[in-house]
């Protein structure tokens, strides 16, 4: 349990060499936002994505409004981003948004005269139009909105494209086709059979598809040929549109789709164009057209379903979809498809699996932002058209026409209210990283918890290497929120890719290819643990490999690819669990989730048994300081590190000899109230390289993730104190601050202008002693370093009391003798109950200060940060990485804990019954390897699915035991009789062979089992059987009893029910429900029950009287009528039932007296 000064040696196990390192773990966020902005590219080289595509779709704004021509065109040339006004740190401090101004070059062209207004090549910078501020992403992949860190998580949804699914109508299997555009970019179109007729469904309106085919210019013969292509002998269903021309069919179609509107050709063309042919309103998107081309075996470029040229509609994929559906319905295996070039290919026919990851795509932050921007720009464009129509054309300029408010509002709404923009989880570096790699199926345009069935939540074979099959929440969101696998990437179309090593002629190469799920289905892929020879050929004659998810044995020549790493299946959280392959998935899920709830400790200690991923979490999460230069450390203190460069760094515009300064964060509050603190781990003169951690952040030790502590544990019953997952701990853990964490609370108070006069932040508070004000400065703000307890004043504030209107005489006297001192009341900010600690920082914001934006009516605001040191206590939740969790039930003195033969007391006692039924045996192997770490003083890394073998652990335990036995002999110690008895018992139990007289051999055998002889600390007697003892990595979780413990004597009541409020935040009471009432009834506790239902609940007069009796020390009198009874009576009155309340003398009592005016 000691923390050594010199870092221990780390020994790495694992036979599989990984050909590529883990990619940057936040790249899914950073790359997406970079592609959205494209601010590093010249305007003429920007691709049509993100911001650029949003502008290109809205501009030029020139359409006629309600038949009236605008006579002007507003066109877009380019955009640029200005510099952010404040740094991220300043934004966090001042509650600002980290953002940059967005400017656009626009030109206004008059159609009649050809005059161009707005931007000209020689125009000054002021001619750029300001479109509002755009929030920027910080280097670590998060946003700062109103001073708080937020993360925009990626959304997974059904990819646009064409899908063929089946359902049964009676015993007949019927197929349906669905053509899906990009979200909010057009209607879903369904093609299904109604008897023999193929119908099309658009916007919940059905019509025969032949109607639309006639609009596309097809005649009776070509439609008949289409429907009888695969079944020439079968007569097609009745066609009610037979003999119609294109125009007649168009009008008929318009009356079906818009039954209320008069059918006119121009209007019908305009409507159908907007519905399916206008790229601005109907968009399959690049992913949709790609999926459609892949499915139908054609190569089309249009992103709409219909084309409109020369006043006529033509097909862009609808006929191909119908032919494929007909072939599927007829049970054909292939369908001949003709490309635009006239090339015929046979395309395989099959229905789609909608949960296949080839059919689901991820909308990353850049796409979500672009969509939101489109919404804002659409509103802006409507405003521009109105101003064009109503304003003076000669006076119009781009700046006058464009109003940026809709764009600003759309961005504010997205970051502030969207389900996908979330308050960042900053509990520890791992939770921070995990939040950015989250994928949600919920959110706008996605699923809802209630509608999502089992299939969409379930693990699919295509999740392999793309989405973690283990890490997901346990509640209603199970399967809907998931995590990206460790090596997975998202391609430009939004499909998740997994990496594989190419196999050529049975030889595995180091060439790595990333593949989407539908491409992977074409190949046979071997696992990463397939044994290889030195020349990278497969060692076995038959290789276990999978094709379309089915594992089979193949010859080496049949294998196309091989996994790059065993951990590519699981997420980062899950890959941190050692011996994961020995854990049941349900418990591994809990272990993955609980690591993100671990509180950073004051004494960080990286795991004795890790997996090798710990370093990458620290470098990629952004919570530690990582060097971006090569050089030598020239200066170090608690606030900054300076590195003198040893070579040029062109990307930073720095040359060799320049000094790079890294600022450190000290005692900053995270979103969850944990302590963000960085401290240097380099010294002056040290050489540093790019990517090296030079300052540890929270939960980091020498650049390795350190979420918990390496604790000596025993797995044994302990007098019932560890019953039902309760956990006994050694008091030394508390005394030596092993599980002590720092938590920082933020309190703030505003001084407003009120009707009665301005509130004032001051030290001059009426009715308080000097002792109560001892820690306040002259302005009434608590000093930094003061220790505060519940009820202490943090910021002194006074407000004017309300007073009655003065009489004319008083006004006269006041005007003669001057204003009398008006009475003020104390409205100071005090420490809430259950809180307190040391004041670490105070900040004061006044209206008019630079960068300060206070709410209307607020003159100034003071914010106080109070840090609290929390030690481990009874009721705190602790857990290991394998899902074994529990609550501390008893803190035992070290002398009473079980101890080893050398006198070392164990630190934690876990219940053995918590292991077998939960099947998380990884924790036992971790404990055994941890015992080797304890005995040898080193640390180990054992990668998931490539762990150290049990045989190796046994040998290591035996070697360590032999050294320990020899040391005992050298010191003159022999095995005593009590230890011999334990070994004899172990022999009877079958743990070891019966030792006979050879107790030395018995000891060596016992060491191989990972068990030890343990002594009871209270009696000194050995525990009757051998016990598993070793080091386990145990974390303290965010669920601390101090935040949850709550008691109420009196407090606020609900205005409507007059019952106490609920919850700790409202200082509420505990609900006494019907089952609790039954319990008191069962025991006949009549008086207690009456008290619960009356004076402790909603008996207003009774509780007032009881309170007064308690204050005066008198006996509490009986109760009166509770409010809920009065409600019941009124309910019965409303049903027309006359209910009267009678006293003992059968006289009617008016229980509503004084409540309502008499009639």
UniProtKB/Swiss-Prot annotation:
Gene Ontology cellular-component terms listed: DNA-directed RNA polymerase complex
EC number annotated for this UniProt entry: 2.7.7.6
Statement: the UniProt record of this protein carries the keyword Amino-acid biosynthesis: no
Alphabetical keyword list: DNA-directed RNA polymerase, Nucleotidyltransferase, Transcription, Transferase
Catalysis performed (reactions): RNA(n) + a ribonucleoside 5'-triphosphate = RNA(n+1) + diphosphate
Biological process, per Gene Ontology: DNA-templated transcription
GO molecular function, one term: DNA-directed RNA polymerase activity
Domain of life: Bacteria
SUPFAM superfamilies registered for this protein in UniProt: beta and beta-prime subunits of DNA dependent RNA-polymerase (SSF64484)
InterPro entries per the UniProt record, alphabetical: DNA-dir_RNA_pol_bsu_ext_1_sf (IPR042107), DNA-dir_RNA_pol_bsu_external_1 (IPR019462), DNA-dir_RNA_pol_su2 (IPR015712), DNA-dir_RNAP_su2_dom (IPR007120), DNA-dir_RNAP_su2_hyb_sf (IPR037033), RNA_pol_bsu_bac (IPR010243), RNA_pol_bsu_CS (IPR007121), RNA_pol_bsu_protrusion (IPR007644)
Coiled-coil ranges per UniProt: none
Assembly and binders: The RNAP catalytic core consists of 2 alpha, 1 beta, 1 beta' and 1 omega subunit. When a sigma factor is associated with the core the holoenzyme is formed, which can initiate transcription.
Described purpose of this protein according to its UniProt entry: DNA-dependent RNA polymerase catalyzes the transcription of DNA into RNA using the four ribonucleoside triphosphates as substrates.
Family: Belongs to the RNA polymerase beta chain family.
Name used for this protein in its record: DNA-directed RNA polymerase subunit beta
Species annotation: Deinococcus radiodurans (strain ATCC 13939 / DSM 20539 / JCM 16871 / CCUG 27074 / LMG 4051 / NBRC 15346 / NCIMB 9279 / VKM B-1422 / R1)
Gene name tied to this protein: rpoB
